[in-house]
Regions:
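Eukaryotic helix-grip
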Residues: 1-217
Length: 217
């Protein structure tokens, strides 16, 4: 199992992020529904008590991913290989999401997230033991400085160029995090702390596949 903790500072409040997250979930669902062999199926959607993060909303979805696979390859695969199951526990500002594939029994992705009103300096937000911390790779992400693959780049989404008409925030400078820290109260800042555990328990491929999933996820 490969475990990483990602810390992603963002120039907004925790409540603003909650609204943005709901929008992106709906947008992603629409994008995934575009023809035969595609779409999102909701199997269960209910409130829960005393679960992960306390009280929240549990959702069980199935993503049909046939559209992402070449037709010649899709034709030889069993149907179980063309679906990914997602279980989600949303007790915002805490969430947990788990992905599995029925066709690959020894594969899973487990993501715990805390959304905090700080610039990413919490020492141990997940209350990891000393042994767990030694196993975890810390990977801070800067939305301005970190490189973006050319095929994914969109100028209208570049934080170095974008300015919000509504909030008047942006564009962001190279040292935006330090600027926000130096002006507490003037600019909202939050951090998404994500503890991601990727497991692919197949001998000979485990380390390579787990690293690949973290790199492209």
């Amino acid at each position: 199992m490969l475990i990483k903790e990602y810390r992603i500072p963002l120039p907004m409040s925790v409540e603003e992020y909650r609204i943005a997250q709901l929008y992106m979930i709906q947008k992603k669902s629409r994008e995934e529904t575009c023809g035969e062999g595609s779409g999102v199926e909701i199997l269960e959607n209910r409130p829960y008590m005393d679960g992960p993060g306390g009280n929240g909303q549990y959702t069980h979805k199935v993503y049909h991913i046939g559209m992402h696979i070449p037709s010649w390859f899709r034709s030889i695969l069993p149907k179980a290989a063309l679906r990914v199951e997602e279980e989600s526990w949303n007790a915002y500002p805490y969430t947990r999401t788990r992905y599995t594939c029925p066709f690959v029994e020894k594969f899973s992705i487990d993501i715990e997230t805390y959304y905090k009103t700080d610039p990413g300096e919490h020492g141990n937000v997940f209350n990891l033991s000393a042994a767990e911390k030694r196993q975890t790779i810390l990977d801070p992400i800067d939305i301005v400085k970190d490189p973006i693959p050319p095929h994914e780049y969109k100028a209208e989404e570049d934080p170095k160029l974008y300015k919000s008409v509504k909030t008047k925030r942006g564009p962001l400078s190279e040292d935006w995090i330090q600027e926000y820290k130096n002006n507490p109260g003037k600019y909202p800042i939050m951090c998404a702390y994500k503890l991601c555990k990727v497991e692919f328990r197949y001998w000979g491929m485990q380390s390579k596949i787990e690293r690949f999933i973290h790199d492209v996820g």
